[in-house]
A protein has these predicted regions:
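Acidic-residue sensor for enzyme active/binding pockets
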Residues: 1, 47, 78, 185, ...
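Single conserved hydrophobic/aromatic residue that forms the stacking wall/gate
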Residues: 1-12, 222, 226-228
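Generic detector of ordered secondary-structure context
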Residues: 4-5, 42, 178
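Catalytic phosphate-handling regions of large nucleic-acid enzymes and associated NTPases
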Residues: 9-158, 162
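Gly/Lys-enriched N-terminal cap/neck module of very large, oligomeric protein machines
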Residues: 157, 163-225
Length: 228
């Protein structure tokens, strides 16, 4: 149970329940856990429990499957690692910051990662190219288009790299005389309201012309459909 005053736990549990943040959410949340543009409701208005994916990380923990060590004040013991039936770090990614450094790992597809792990177990000398045949790149929860593989390959090879993402869009007829650009997927962790604001600013400053309206119907917290 999460105490209402424990802000860090509140933020963490909200992130773990968001399908647009996690490739495989670890928290099954009931209530408003936020969107790409809005934060979650106060903890007293939400309920949460471990999702099936989280239970897969802790299954058989009481069967001596992993080593235990004392906690910080030696009053309890805690597992050094979780049994983890799947590679959670790769599947859900991670974000962290420390003094002078930061880490951001994007999410990946569960089936692809497990296939690569099984191949690596049977072929310990497998090359990066061999593994990328199974995992060609990140699998972002909200979709979007990854531009180029060079940055991804460098990140896999050295642990440092970057890649660009773009929205996914198509043109469709809005009326007999008008056509619109319909954006169906946005880059990872980019909210539709932010995009609409930037487009309107560009139109207002005359940097972008030919736009008569920008709309984003509310169709779900993890969905996107903007019409320009």
């Amino acid at each position: 149970e999460i105490a209402p005053s424990d802000w860090s736990s509140d933020v963490c549990s909200s992130d773990l329940a968001q399908p647009f943040t996690m490739r495989l959410p670890l928290i099954d949340g009931h209530g408003n856990f936020g969107s790409l543009d809005d934060g979650p409701a106060a903890p007293r208005y939400t309920e949460a429990r471990l999702a099936a994916s989280a239970l897969a990380l802790t299954a058989d923990l009481d069967e001596d499957t992993v080593d235990f060590a004392p906690n910080y004040d030696y009053t309890l013991t805690e597992p050094e690692v979780l049994p983890a039936a799947f590679p959670n770090l790769l599947v859900n990614g991670a974000a962290g910051i420390a003094v002078g450094m930061a880490t951001n790992m994007p999410p990946h597809n569960l089936v692809e990662v497990v296939a690569a792990a099984r191949h690596l177990l049977t072929h310990p000398e497998a090359s990066l190219e061999d593994l990328m045949a199974f995992v060609p790149g990140p699998d972002l929860p909200a979709g979007g288009m990854i531009v180029g593989l060079d940055g991804i390959r460098e990140a896999y090879r050295t642990g440092r790299g970057k890649f660009l993402t773009r929205a996914t869009a198509h043109v469709e007829s809005i009326s007999p005389r008008r056509k619109g650009i319909v954006i169906t997927e946005l880059p990872y962790m980019v909210g539709p309201e932010k995009v609409i604001t930037r487009i309107k600013e560009a139109v207002g400053s005359k940097k972008l012309q030919g736009i008569t309206d920008v709309a984003a119907p509310k169709i779900g917290r993890a969905s996107c459909r903007e019409r320009v």
